[in-house]
Amino acid sequence: MVSGRQGVGIVFGMEPIWTPAPARVEGSLLAQFMSVAGVESYADLHARSIADPAWFWRQFWDSCGVVGQAGDRVLIEGERMREAVFFPDARLNVVDTLLARNDDSLALMFRGEAGHALDMIWSELHARVSQYQQALREAAVGVGSRVAAMMANTPDIYALMLATASVGAVFTSVSPDFGAAAAVDRFSQVEPDLLFASDRYC
């Protein structure tokens, strides 16, 4: 297998500054992907991805753990890259992938400016997301709704963001240390249907 760094050095006509040890290369996610895809070198993978982008992106979907249905079509090509449509028939919610784990391992680690510490395991995060989901549904928040939050970057705001995305709504937030005018300017752009606010800054 030829590493990506070696390939870069060859292309630009110079020696690489650093080359990883073979064991590190073999243990990389890229090497694992190449093995599953059945290609021998990075150069082969790159060439195949250009010659057959639909093949490449199907391989990527199948190997990266996305939870959802990819659909039959992988790529609708446009005249320019920005016009291309990937997986037009896919059905998924990114939260299903982000919350694929539900065990007692660490999910979030929070340390506040005043020394407050909070660690949240995956099962606790699931429970907190569920609480927010229920509150959102009771407030008739769904696909296309807009939810805003004036909250610090604690595990709670991540749970709220995940819950909002899980019901198909749009999420935006500002920190409590925003001034009133700045918060109004941000939120007025999206005209939220529901606003969450914390009573303190962590």
Language model features by range: what are they?
Residues 30-31, 35-37, 95-121:
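AMP-dependent adenylate-forming
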Residues 48-50, 58-71, 88-109:
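A short N-terminal helical cap/helix-turn-helix that marks the beginning
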Residues 41, 140-146, 165-170, 193:
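Short, surface-exposed connector motifs at secondary-structure boundaries
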